[in-house]
Amino acid sequence: MEYNFETKYELVKKAFDNSYSKYSKFKVGALLILKNGEYIQGTNVENASFGLTNCAERTALFYAYTLGYRQDDILELVIMADSEELTYPCGACRQVIMELMNHDAIITLVNLKKKTLSMKVSDLMPGYFGEEYLNV
């Protein structure tokens, strides 16, 4: 299946709308586009114990891995937040994205006004902490 901008927007918007963000009121949705034509959505899920909150990007990626998908299966990650400026992933999400996605995959940021920015995963976090530092 080919995903044009409007299709991606509608799918990530559904994830965004499902956000459980009763504390911050800051909704985020994520959409993974897979090479086989399927997609996976994720949303942020907050908790009264704020450290237990899970971001939309990690929700989508962890679910993809739970289903058996891996780096080579993921073409693009689309991230939507309700802000005037585009919202980049937090540091924890960037680290997970660098670990679980190919560095030449695409990240697309979008807001509700349909402003977008696309980049490669490698552009997101130069000098990230990877397995080469663990001597494994």
Regions found by a protein language model. Give the residues of each.
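C-terminal binding/interaction regions
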Residues: E2-S21, Y39, D72-V136
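Short, well-ordered amphipathic alpha-helical segments that serve as non-catalytic structural scaffolds
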Residues: K14, A56-A64
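Short solvent-exposed loop/turn micro-motifs enriched in small/polar/acidic residues
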Residues: Y23-K25
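Short beta-strand scaffold segments in enzyme catalytic cores
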Residues: K27-L34
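Short, charged/polar surface micro-motifs in flexible loops or helix N-caps
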Residues: N36-Y39, N47
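Compact, glycine-rich, soluble single-domain proteins
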Residues: N44-T59
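Phosphate/pyrophosphate-binding loops at sites that engage ATP/ADP/AMP, CoA/4′-phosphopantetheine
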Residues: Y65-Q71
